[in-house]
Every structure is written in structure tokens, then in C-alpha cells.
Amino acid sequence: MASPALAAALAAAAAEGPNGSDAGEWGSGGGANASGTDWVPPPGQYSAGAVAGLAAVVGFLIVFTVVGNVLVVIAVLTSRALRAPQNLFLVSLASADILVATLVMPFSLANELMAYWYFGQVWCGVYLALDVLFCTSSIVHLCAISLDRYWSVTQAVEYNLKRTPRRVKATIVAVWLISAVISFPPLVSFYRRPDGAAYPQCGLNDETWYILSSCIGSFFAPCLIMGLVYARIYRVAKLRTRTLSEKRGPAGPDGASPTTENGLGKAAGENGHCAPPRTEVEPDESSAAERRRRRGALRRGGRRREGAEGDTGSADGPGPGLAAEQGARTASRSPGPGGRLSRASSRSVEFFLSRRRRARSSVCRRKVAQAREKRFTFVLAVVMGVFVLCWFPFFFSYSLYGICREACQLPEPLFKFFFWIGYCNSSLNPVIYTVFNQDFRRSFKHILFRRRRRGFRQ
């Protein structure tokens, strides 16, 4: 992957010529004589400085893509905050980007700098199929993720129960199979050297039917599905936020924290943590009056037993919130029906308090889960938007060429620029996760700096 080694390999390949028997089959034009010897390399379209510069830039892009996506895989598999089943989609998507960087980009760079295909006819077909496969799998992954987001928003309880790791893995297998079906045609219809070409070339089928079908299947149809699904998600989320705000009014029920603009309570902030539930309960007027009445009865009973038992009762207890419980415990130690009544009231108070704590805790957990779901949905929307921005220029210009040919053909340098911008997308997803998701950011820091600290200690 290092750029000096890649540049040296390109120079050696240019001096050597096409490999094996394919040189006679593919390169028998003006660049070779009848016997296939004294092969002359094509005139390079880049200077030596440009070759070194491009090799360095693309080499850095390859290394950055591999390292970033490997970090994504490690983070999802090791971080407790990222171990949700739906994050397996991100592992598979990162794997596709790693394969693009290792199996496609180096050969695309060599083909670009050498101005001919050096690696033989068989690998040409495999290379083209892998190129289309990984690009198609990326967008089909994003399409499956958008459907997963939609079902988790519209059928939260039912779908979350069904979304097990096994189901997610089965969906990922289906995504790769669909991508393979779409990318299979290059294996049987890849582009061969046109008549009169002096040097072997490797390109996709140039017929209109293939250009349009591959563009629709690999890009435009999944993009349409993603756009419709995310528009529906936005409408559902907006309607749900409006309904909640109308129900709550200016103040939330039961003293709940006010909501922010995105419908999340302050207790479930950006870091996904809840404020600890309060143990004190603010009862209504009737329950307060009832508790005062019980406290007075217990206090009077305690005074009557004070001389015999030496017990001070609950009159000087720590506070009104705990006086009833302490009085109940004091009375429960005395015999008679009053003790049984006090014991029952103590149990009812404790049950009431524990039930309120459990209710607040469950609400808190639900808010944290909703906050994470919303952040995850937003991050994936950014990922999809960046993917479309990177690949749309290439697919639009490519399909335009398939329709009107030379009349709509872009200048070759611009078309190649669009082509490489699409490859750059494979390196951007880890950056997006780092910028927009705190769980990924924290996990990346943990992976990188914890291991570095261990190395310093050793």
C-alpha cells in the first residue's frame, strides 16, 4: 500500500509489458510485433512527478480507508454502547469499504497510471465484478439500514423484539446476495480491447442496455427507496413530536423534565445518560393529609407506651418523608391491632415508593434508548447523504453517456475525477461516525489511546 513500492511496481510493470500469454492476445496491436517480442509500453499520460504524487495520494487514501474501517469493526464488536444488533450493518458496510480499498483501488490506480491493463483478462473480469459488487453492496446496505430505521420508528416495541443478531445477520447475507446478482453481468460481459487498440484495456460493457441497467440497479433505484423511506421517517418523527408536545403542554406530567426541540428530555441528553431518579415523592394533598393523620395517631400511641417501653416513637424523626416509615416500624413492634395496621401502612408506603422508583427508572431507560435511536438515525442519514453526493456525479454522467453517447460525454479528466470521488466515499464513514456520534468517538479514543498507554507502560 505504500506509495514508493507502488510507484516502483508500476515502473517495473511498464518496462516489462503485459503478463503471460495475455500480452499476445490483448496487446497484439501497434505496440507489439507479430512475434509478440520487443513490446513497447504505451506513452505515459503522466509525468514521473505526477505518477509519484498520484501514487502517494491514493496510497494514503487506501491506508486511511483500511485503518478507519477496521476501527469501526473493532469498536462495534468490543464497545458495550455499540453492541446493538443493528450496528452489525455498520460492520458489514465497513467490511465492504475495506475490500474496496484492498482489492479494487490499487488496480484502478495502476490502470490509470499505466494507461493499459497489465493484469490479464481473467483478473479484468474479476476486478470489474468486485468493483461493481462492493459499490452496489454499500448502497444496498444503506437501503437495508433505512428500512431498519423505519421499522424501529413505526413499530418500536414489536420490531425491537424481532431484531435479534440472527435476523440482522440473515438480512446482511441477503444484502450481499442481491448485490452479487446485480454485479454478476460484468463477469460475462466485460469490455474487451476495441478493434485497432494497441494495448490491452479493461472496462465495463459499453452497450446502452448494460449502462442503464447497472446504473438503475446499483444506484438510482436504491437511492429512490432510501429517499422515500427517510421522508416517511421524518414525517412520523415530526408527527410524534407534535403529539407529545400537545399532550404535555407547557409542563410535562408528574414533574417530568422539559423537552428539547428534537423531542428528547433533558434527562436523556446527548451522552445518553439519565439523571438519577429522586427518591422523594411529592404526594398530592389528599395523601399528605392522610399521612399527617397517621403520623398523629402513631405519635399518640408512642407517648402512651413511652414509659413502659422506653421508646421515643417517631415525633423527632429525621423529616416528614421518613416519619411515617419510622412510625410504622415503631408501631409494628407493639402488639395489638394497632401494630398490625401500622405494619400494613408501612408496607404500603414502601411499596408505593419502590413502584415510583421503578417507574421513573423505566422511563429513564426508555428515554435513553430513544435518544440513542434518534442519534443513530441522524448519523445514518448523514452517511447516506454523503454517499449520494460522492457517487451521484459518476452515475449521472455515466448514464447520460449511455443515452446520448458522444453528444453528452464529459471531458475524460472530469469523468475520472467523478470516478475517484466515488472511491473516496469508502474513507468517509469513519470520519462521519467520529464527528456525529459520541459513542463511536469515545470507543475510538479507548481503542487508540488505551493501547498506546499500555505500550508506554511496558
Curated annotation (Swiss-Prot):
Keyword entries, A-Z: Cell membrane, Disulfide bond, G-protein coupled receptor, Glycoprotein, Membrane, Receptor, Transducer, Transmembrane, Transmembrane helix
Transmembrane segments: 52-76, 89-114, 125-147, 169-191, 208-231, 380-403, 417-437
Compartmental location: Cell membrane
Gene Ontology CC: axon terminus; cytoplasm; glutamatergic synapse; neuronal cell body; postsynaptic density membrane
Site note Implicated in catechol agonist binding and receptor activation, residues: S214, S218
Residue ranges annotated as Extracellular topological domain: 1-51, 115-124, 192-207, 404-416
Principal location listed in the UniProt entry: membrane
Keyword Disulfide bond: yes
Gene Ontology molecular function: any one: protein heterodimerization activity
Residues exposed to the Cytoplasmic side: 77-88, 148-168, 232-379, 438-458
Annotated site residue numbers, Implicated in ligand binding: D131
Membrane topology note: Multi-pass membrane protein
Keyword match Nucleotide-binding: no
UniProt feature, compositional bias: Basic residues: 291-303
Function as written in the Swiss-Prot or TrEMBL entry: Alpha-2 adrenergic receptors mediate the catecholamine-induced inhibition of adenylate cyclase through the action of G proteins.
Family from the record: Belongs to the G-protein coupled receptor 1 family. Adrenergic receptor subfamily. ADRA2C sub-subfamily.
Protein name: Alpha-2C adrenergic receptor
Species in which this protein is naturally found: Mus musculus (Mouse)
